[in-house]
């Protein structure tokens, strides 16, 4: 048993589950770069087929916000870009390409090709940035032997790679992506699988995430504490809301 202090309040836990994007790493820094590349590849691909590109018609489908000259500057935390899987995003964009006149098979092929190109550009840039206070908090967890796992809508291989870029992958006993479950967030399967992997009960587990989907998954799985991070104005389903990891702490050794 470990005592976790959140906003000065104490909770007894045996482990922590973390969402990845927007929770461990800065969402906009990583996925903004990916989206910018993806949209540009889509624009070029459609232009080659004689299809006019109206950016707002595409971005509003995913819930991404952009500057007048194009770069992504924000996103809807309730939207598919924030909460959906890569396959969700692919299906939404392919549906739009189909409505633009492409046969479904060609629409899927175009979006998948653009997605692969965007991922390759991300590998070149490595734009991942840790949230403030994360490294300190993970080290404190390690000092207490607290088991940790990641539960993400991203694919497991990609998630592991992003955490490796940050130099934090070794902190997690397991990383569970959307490809390892039959039903992704907000279904509780991912959280329950993570708890089983760590050998802990959901009722003794904290979950940290940045979307309502994370909180819904945690509640459905029966975790004892849901913590919303970086969510101004609160987050539905969160027991506690913090701006960053500086609001999380542990009592000095010997006091827990």
What are these regions (language model features)?
Residues 147-149, 225:
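Proline-centered loop/turn at the N-terminus of a beta-strand
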Residues 1-16, 44, 49, 135-142, ...:
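Asp-based, Mg2+/Mn2+-dependent phosphohydrolase catalytic module
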Residues 5-6, 11-132, 144:
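N-terminal helical cap/lid subdomain that shapes the substrate entry/recognition surface
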Residues 124-129, 153, 183, 226:
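Short, flexible loop segments at the rims of nucleotide/cofactor-binding pockets, characterized by
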Residues 23, 152-154:
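Conserved phosphate-coupling serine/threonine residues in phosphotransfer and NTP-handling enzymes
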């Amino acid at each position: 048993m470990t005592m976790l202090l959140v906003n000065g309040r104490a909770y007894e836990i045996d482990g922590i589950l973390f969402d990845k994007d927007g929770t461990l790493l800065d969402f906009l820094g990583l996925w903004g770069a990916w989206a910018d590349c993806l949209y540009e590849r889509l624009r070029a691909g459609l232009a080659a087929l004689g299809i006019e590109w109206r950016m707002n018609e595409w971005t509003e489908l995913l819930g991404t916000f952009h500057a007048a000259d194009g770069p992504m500057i924000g996103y809807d935390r309730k939207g598919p870009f924030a909460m959906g899987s890569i396959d969700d995003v692919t299906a939404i964009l392919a549906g739009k390409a189909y409505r633009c006149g492409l046969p479904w098979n060609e629409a899927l092929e175009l979006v998948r090709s653009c997605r692969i190109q965007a991922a390759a550009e991300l590998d070149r840039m490595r734009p991942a940035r840790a949230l403030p206070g994360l490294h300190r908090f993970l080290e404190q967890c390690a000092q207490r032997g607290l088991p940790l796992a990641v539960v993400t809508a991203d694919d497991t291989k990609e998630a592991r790679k992003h955490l490796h870029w940050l130099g934090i992958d070794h902190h997690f006993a397991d990383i569970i992506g959307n490809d390892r479950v039959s039903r992704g967030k907000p279904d509780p399967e991912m959280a329950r699988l993570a708890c089983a992997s760590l050998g802990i009960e959901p009722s003794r587990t904290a979950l940290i995430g940045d979307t309502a989907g994370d909180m819904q998954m945690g509640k459905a799985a029966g975790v004892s504490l849901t913590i919303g991070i970086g969510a101004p104005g609160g987050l539905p389903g969160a027991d506690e809301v913090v701006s960053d990891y500086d609001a999380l702490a542990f009592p000095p050794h010997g006091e827990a």
